[in-house]
């Protein structure tokens, strides 16, 4: 279980999030959606204990992947994934291998991350989070800059991870991905939660937050049926 208890979140002397009460538990894939500046990343950082005054979190229990996280050039894919074991103080091979397989990188374990595609490098960072073997994943836009097929594959992996008993909270800017994969959709606008419900029930609030025309259907048309 992880969440936020309603305390206002202030940055630079300005309240950017207020009246936020959110709880996410095992088995859930919670997608945070909303327009730019809505406070999605700020809320996730607060939940991860990365903001001044926010409760510190145990890095063995929570895997945090910030927006735009980059691999260290010169490392191999396996070495990047192994960084996820640092909070545990060990270099156990088994969790790293499971992470590589889960992220579809077992064939690239010895490849340098500066010699693979951007999408593969992003998956290497995700493998780092998986190698931590956490109870909770807090991921800020892990599908950014990926092609639709790769983004769908990562979201399907995260949904399966949640179904296996982990808690996954993810910022997703592509509304169609969130509607297709989330078990809960949390919509933020102007620093407040405007909806927190299963995707079908939160659709109207999500469309309003993104400024979509009334009656517009943003549901996915090109993604395969969810397993």
What do these predicted ranges mean?
Residues 48:
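Helix-to-loop junction immediately C-terminal to a conserved catalytic motif
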Residues 172-173:
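H-loop/switch region of ABC-family ATPase nucleotide-binding domains
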Residues 129-130:
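ABC ATPase C-loop
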Residues 33-35:
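The feature captures the beta-strand-to-loop junction immediately N-terminal to the Walker
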Residues 137-141:
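Catalytic Walker B motif of ABC-type/P-loop ATPase nucleotide-binding domains
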Residues 93-108:
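Conserved ABC ATPase "signature" region
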Residues 112-116:
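Conserved ABC ATPase signature
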Residues 207-227:
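ABC ATPase nucleotide-binding domains
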């Amino acid at each position: 279980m992880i969440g936020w208890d309603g305390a206002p979140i202030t940055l630079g002397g300005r309240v950017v999030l207020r009246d936020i009460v959110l709880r996410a538990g095992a088995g859930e894939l919670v997608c945070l959606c909303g327009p730019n500046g809505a406070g999605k990343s700020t809320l996730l950082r607060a939940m991860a204990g990365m903001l001044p005054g926010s409760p510190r979190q145990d890095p063995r229990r929570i895997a945090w992947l910030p927006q735009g996280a980059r691999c260290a050039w010169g490392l191999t894919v396996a070495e990047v994934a192994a960084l996820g074991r640092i909070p545990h103080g060990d270099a156990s091979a088994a969790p790293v291998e499971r992470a590589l397989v889960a992220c579809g990188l077992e064939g690239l374990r010895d490849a340098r991350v500066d010699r693979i595609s951007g999408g593969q490098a992003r998956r290497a960072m995700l493998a780092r989070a998986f190698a931590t073997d956490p109870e909770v994943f807090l991921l800020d836009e892990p599908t950014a800059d990926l092609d639709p097929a790769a983004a769908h594959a990562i979201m399907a992996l995260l949904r399966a991870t949640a179904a296996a008993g982990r808690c996954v909270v993810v910022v997703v800017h592509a509304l169609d991905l969130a509607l297709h994969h989330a078990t809960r959709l949390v919509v933020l606008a102007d620093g407040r939660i405007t909806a927190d419900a299963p995707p079908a029930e939160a659709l109207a609030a999500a469309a309003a937050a993104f400024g979509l025309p009334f009656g517009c259907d943003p549901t996915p048309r090109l993604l395969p049926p969810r397993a």
